[in-house]
Amino acid sequence: MPKPPVVVVFDMDETLGSFGQLGILKDVIESYEDRHLTQDEFNRIIDKHPEFIRPGILEILEFVVGQRNKKLCDSIMIYTNNQGPRSWAQSISEYFSYKIGTPVFDHIVAAFMVNGHRVEPSRTSHEKIYNDFIRCARLPSTTEVCFVDDVEHPRMIHDNVYYVKIKPYHYRLPISHCLERIYPSDSDRQLECLSRAQARFHPNSLRGDEKTPEEQEVDKVIGRFMLKHMHDFFLGLKRTHGKTKRKYSYRSRRRTRHL
């Protein structure tokens, strides 16, 4: 009997990183420049704001890509309810490919609907549902899934799912500070972009909410535990699919892991 496919699936917002203010910056800069940013320009903006990326996530993605290279993982995917255009999730995906140095995500399952328009035809609901995911990704029902999300979705709890529920990652910098990083020697651009941001967005979304050293350490610890659970997932698969007789059933011991 062939082994079932193995996929690792990540939520996007507050799981891979904190991208709300990144969206504001992209919107404001594109308005100022009167053009769309290139992927390289988008990448440079994130590189100037490493706080937007969850601590430890690059190491986690490198590990999972390594498992895929060893043929122990068939696909790495994003399953998101983000209400932006599909191109937004694609830009985030391509940033991680740039950082890792190789394509990371094989497929993106986008939101059910955005602004009243159907985006992902094979989804049946805004809920994240195991059967919807399998259908959208065109996978067999035997697929083994490691699913990482900062929200507990009851209908993603399934015998085939190793569910890692993590603490949401938030990091907000004052937009004025972000613009100083992007245009360090051009105060006119800083002021014009800030003015556009103030005209378009609620004041609270432009304020900073920087973390204490203790909070930052908690985020690093969560990143280390996420990586440990990735190791545990693949170790469990080896025990389940190995040729030697199992001493216990990996699947029967599954439950949602809370971090």
Spans of features found by a protein language model:
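C-terminal cap/substrate-recognition subdomain and adjoining C-terminal extension
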Residues: 85-259
